[in-house]
């Protein structure tokens, strides 16, 4: 007779969880060394029931769990601090109440934050290095996407450090701006490299260089700096500075001449004023009437002429002074820019000396970054650039070039383009590929401008250009995902 199955007393006990996805994430975090690395971070707080490091890990897990507020750890519909299965997956004895997590976060110093960031970078570095190598093997190029996105907070709050009012989600709101960089990854599609928090009034145009530097720091790879282009630009800039200095010298000479003419007129006015005063005394002493053609009347007319002339000379002097001030400011600006360019060239020469393995790299940026100085900088740093221009004057200039017979190229379901090669934009001396976009939205026609610098002859494949640039929607999708919580 067969025996009935009996329960194995040593079998593991099943533990229920309301946060199932956090379990494999925790096991993976253990596998890659994240948990162990975070447990080694120094935090200036004594242990009570749980270590400060456990509470920092709990804070990370609460973010992954979608806790919009810290108190959700204990008071949410599925309290995380009661989930032993998740704690065990993250190699912890249990979770603290949210108030304990709050006290630990308050105890963290700048050094603690730096240590946590370093821990995260150490753990993520092998993944980034692998994707960099795969991307270079697969396509021979690294493709970066950069963006600046708003992170609004309560408009009445006074407890968020460094928050400021700025443009976020089509409205002025209180909060922060997050500068993000991602890498196009053969394995994951999108691999986040860096995020930096800034006050809410930060604008995209001020962050282009920082995004590039963050990408290079995370990947450890950079292209060959285009020092030849920059050196030529400096030569041209010196010529512009010399021209500005000549105009400044001319303005100084003009001011000197204007002062001389003013002094001459003032001297004549004083002379005729004295004549009028003497004649008035004489006429009163002799009781003579002042007739229209008398000496006194003629002297008064000559004095009036000098006074009007003096007023004009004073205005001439004011104009000459303003003109000289503008010329002096122009020279000062040119000198400052030349010094900046020379420092950039020196740095880029050093970069090339310490770059035995230059790579090909592309940066895709939205219109907020696409002004002339930023495009020029990225070109000089060695990047191929895909961006948009938001300058209304450029859009209008391109629209005026389009004739009724000019053919538009269909590049999307609701998009057409016309492209030109060898164009320049304000404050960028390098020739660019420029395309005018046309979109039909209802009864309205909208326009945009794409910019490109690089090896690809994008004007011969405008549909490919349009598609590749809009591939940066992966970072925009990531931004939207990051603004929502994981459920």
Per-region residue spans from a language model:
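DNA-recognition alpha helix
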Residues: 69-90
């Amino acid at each position: 007779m067969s025996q009935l199955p009996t329960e194995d007393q040593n079998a593991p006990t099943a533990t229920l969880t309301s946060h199932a996805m956090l379990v494999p994430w925790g096991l993976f975090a253990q596998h890659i060394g994240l948990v162990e690395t975070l447990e080694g971070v120094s935090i200036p707080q004594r242990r009570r029931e749980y270590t400060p490091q456990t509470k920092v890990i709990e804070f990370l897990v609460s973010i992954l769990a979608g806790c919009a507020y810290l108190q959700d750890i204990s008071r949410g519909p599925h309290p995380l601090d009661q989930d032993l299965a998740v704690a065990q997956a993250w190699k912890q004895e249990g979770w603290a109440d949210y108030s304990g997590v709050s006290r630990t976060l308050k105890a963290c110093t700048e050094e603690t934050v730096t240590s946590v960031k370093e821990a995260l970078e150490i753990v993520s570095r092998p993944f980034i290095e692998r994707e960099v190598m795969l991307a270079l093997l697969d396509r021979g190029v690294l493709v970066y996407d950069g963006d600046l996105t708003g992170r609004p907070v309560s408009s009445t709050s006074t407890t968020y450090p460094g928050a400021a009012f700025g443009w976020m989600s089509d409205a002025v709101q209180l909060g922060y701006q997050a500068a993000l960089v991602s890498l196009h990854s053969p394995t994951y599609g999108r691999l986040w490299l860096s995020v930096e928090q800034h006050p809410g009034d930060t604008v995209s145009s001020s962050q282009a260089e920082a995004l590039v530097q963050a990408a290079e720091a995370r990947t450890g790879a950079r292209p060959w700096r285009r020092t030849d282009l920059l050196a030529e630009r400096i030569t041209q800039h010196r010529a512009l500075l010399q021209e500005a200095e000549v105009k400044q010298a001319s303005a100084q000479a003009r001011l000197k001449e204007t002062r001389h003419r003013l002094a001459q007129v003032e001297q004549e006015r004083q002379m005729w004023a004295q004549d009028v005063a003497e004649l008035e005394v004489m006429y009163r002493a002799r009781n003579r009437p002042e007739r229209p053609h008398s000496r006194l009347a003629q002297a008064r007319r000559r004095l009036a002429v000098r006074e009007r002339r003096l007023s004009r000379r004073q205005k001439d002097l004011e104009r000459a002074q303003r003109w000289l001030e503008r010329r002096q400011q122009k020279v000062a600006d040119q000198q400052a820019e030349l010094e900046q360019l020379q420092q950039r060239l020196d740095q880029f020469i050093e970069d090339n000396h310490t770059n035995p393995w230059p790579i090909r790299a592309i940066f895709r940026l939205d219109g907020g970054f696409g002004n002339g100085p930023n495009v020029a900088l990225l070109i000089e740093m060695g990047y191929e650039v895909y961006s948009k221009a938001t300058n209304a004057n450029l859009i209008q200039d391109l629209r005026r070039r389009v004739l009724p017979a000019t053919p538009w190229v269909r590049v999307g379901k609701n998009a057409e383009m016309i492209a030109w090669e060898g164009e320049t934009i304000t404050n960028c001396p390098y020739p660019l590929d420029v395309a005018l976009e046309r979109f039909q939205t209802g009864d309205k026609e909208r326009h945009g401008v794409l910019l490109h610098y690089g090896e690809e002859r994008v004007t011969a494949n405008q549909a490919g250009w349009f598609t590749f640039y809009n591939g940066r929607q992966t970072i925009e999708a990531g931004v939207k995902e990051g603004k929502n919580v994981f459920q």
